Amino acid sequence: MIASRRHFLHLLAGLTTARAVNAADSPKLNLTAAARYVEERKGYALYIKHRGRVIHESYANGAKRGEARRIYSGTKGFWGLAAMAAVEDGYLKLEEKVSATIPEWSGGKKDITIEQLLDFTCGLERGLRLHQDGLTNRNQMALDRPLVATPGKSFIYGPSALQVYHEVLKRKLAAQKRPVSPTHYLERRVLRPLGLGPQRYLPDAKGNPLLAAGFMLSPNQWSRMGDLLLANGKPVLKPESMDMLLEGSAANAAFSFGFWNNRAAGKLGAREIDIEDMLELDWDRQNWSRVCIAKGVPKDLIACIGSSYQRLFAIPSLDLVIIRQGLNAKFSDGDFLRTLLG
């Protein structure tokens, strides 16, 4: 798709930057309409790659190319990759009980598994205070959270489960012949292979990072996660590890290890919802039955979702990676994707 003269002048004005597309090699995309949709809803960036090649970049509302912005819960996926890397390296087993590493967990917490921490079905209270700055030991705070649901039965989205996972990984790695911190392990096994450096970790006084949020990435940097999703885990994980990572749970088949999927879109009775709106409800009022990100778009779509509609979409069947960064302004995943894909 070749940019129109008007659009070209728009580029020169510095409001939008776009790259021409060879229509014979790329899917038919409504790039102009999608960029307008993003810009009109307080979007800062729309960045699209096809087969690893950038086919569209646009920046609006004062944003500039190359700026790193908060991806909020998009951070979770990187730690999910680190968890599966630790499984591959023999440090963790998903079915292993957390209490095998954290013996102080007893009673109802005794049988919680590492996998239940990573798919947010462990039953722990959400622990939203763990997002705060200036904490002494957020890992201990997470370990002390009470059980509010039977492990394995309910999806409870919040930072506490991931902080417990961090404590497990921290103790596992500390026991090795050459001990390293989880942060250094993340950098070596996940970030460096993706061409990324150290990130914004928001450590507490004990040095524990916040796993639920914190990273700041440019569209180009974040798109490397999308490249990995299209490549079924390369260069970080084996394909079979990716299958486990994206499996979902009985409590919420659309989520696992920091990633959201659209598989239900191809099923009878699928429910397209605004995931951020659903997460705003108390956990026991949320309904994750048959939910999908967007109807009418490929069901193999995978998403990393951050607050205020920070989005990474990867669509393997179309070889597409799509990044949207901006503010919350009546943005709809379904409307945006249908606008772009037609």
Where do the PLM segments sit?
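Active-site-proximal alpha-helical segments within enzyme catalytic domains
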Residues: 164-168, 213-234, 310-325
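Active-site helix/loop module of the DD-peptidase/beta-lactamase fold
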Residues: 88-122, 174-213, 217, 233-234
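Active-site SXXK
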Residues: 52, 68-95, 117, 165-170, ...
